[in-house]
Amino acid sequence: MKGILRMGLVAVAALAAACAPRERTLVLLSTNDMHAKIQNFPRLASAVEACRDTAQLVVLVDAGDRWTGNAYVDMAPTPGMPMIALMNELGFDVATLGNHEFDHGQAFLGRMIDSMDFEVVCANVVSDTCTFPQLPPYTVIDRDGIRIGFVGVVTNYEGPGHPAGNESSFAGLEFPDPQAMALKYAAELRPECDVLVLVSHMGDDRDAELLAKGQSQYDVVIGGHTHEEVDTLIGGTLLTQTGKDLRNIGVTTVRMKGHKVAGVDYRIVPLADYEPDILYQKQVEAYYADPGLNKPVGRFGNAADKWGLANWMAAAVADEADADVGFYHIGGVRLDSIPAGGVSAAKVYGLEPFGTLVARMEMTPAQMRRMIVSKYNDPVNAKEAHRIDLISTTPYVIVTDAADNALDVQFPKLREGRKYKVAVSDYIYRNYKDMEYTGGEITVEKVADILLEELRDDSPLKIDNTPRQRVVRK
């Protein structure tokens, strides 16, 4: 009798095990802020292919800013197309928009979206123009019966009211609050999905702010915009970001028990750990075979760091406009350094990839002070606040209180009350708050062209890496 009972218990246990939900693993591979760095794409291809060889359920995701940052992509016959062609071939599944997707205008972006073989989702862009398609707010991907929902959002904080960029790029488009849209579509999509992912180009600070509200129903946030390496858990949601420039790939492992999420893990994997895929390497080399971009146009007599490059650009806009003072925003300096020796056109376009124009006006020291203090204390763009953002040809000192709020700006070489001729980038002119001036205008002179001309005419250039601006606490 006992033997029969034991056999019955074993049979019941076996039946229970057979009926238990099957455990499976879903892998989300993610990139963000690739900024046209196709030189690293062959290593990305190797990493993705290695994962697909070992994992059955894989989704490849990008969180925006696919171009702007590499002349071989940005100045291709169709700007941006080398990156999109490589992404199509590798088989990206879904992406959202970044602010730099709009750099060439919305009509161009609309045409580029038609060239993308992957789904582009964005819940907080509303189009009222025929030049730009109305994008879906989300998509649902099925992997072996597991339904994964992806909601996309893009920043609207820097515009204000739209992503950072020229106002003309956003005519006819509205950008509702990305956090509100993320919450709205999470509530709508959650009942339909086993896994819910927010693909965000708001920045990790805004992502964390959203999750801290405690209303999120997302399992994972795949983030971008702020170029940070992020791996943190907030309110049960995993918040991730891989940095920038295809230096890393994000690997999110979602353990599923039946149709329930049993656990989520994340790793940032350096792509330097992978050998380049040979076929992708050949394609990239073909894109780089451009003698017009490769040939040095001049020389640096010494290595330039980021401060030195910013000093050079501020001086260049001032010289071109015959101004007394030049300002350049540090966010527009897109390289961290350039070594001594030959400097190619590609390097200059990598330093200044936006087609930035020179703007000129007249300002008093009081008006310059107001501009600098406003930017330093910026309550909206927290990542750009409380740092020296405006590099200038004239020295100045920002005086702060104990809480690091700017109180004053001292100009040792300027005379109070006098009007000075001032030159800035058109990005500053169009977008910075509390700008007061007289006689302002945007010229047709491009910053990159000015830098190239200087290299051709005055090489070797000696770059001054000495910071002219500093912050002191009162």
Residues covered by each model-derived region:
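Sec-dependent signal peptide recognition
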Residues: 2-10
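N-terminal leader/targeting segments
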Residues: 10-12, 202
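C-terminal motif of bacterial Sec signal peptides marking the signal peptidase cleavage site
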Residues: 15-18
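Acidic, metal/ion-coordinating pockets
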Residues: 20-275, 305-316, 326, 362, ...
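Catalytic centers of hydrolytic enzymes
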Residues: 24, 31, 37, 169-171, ...
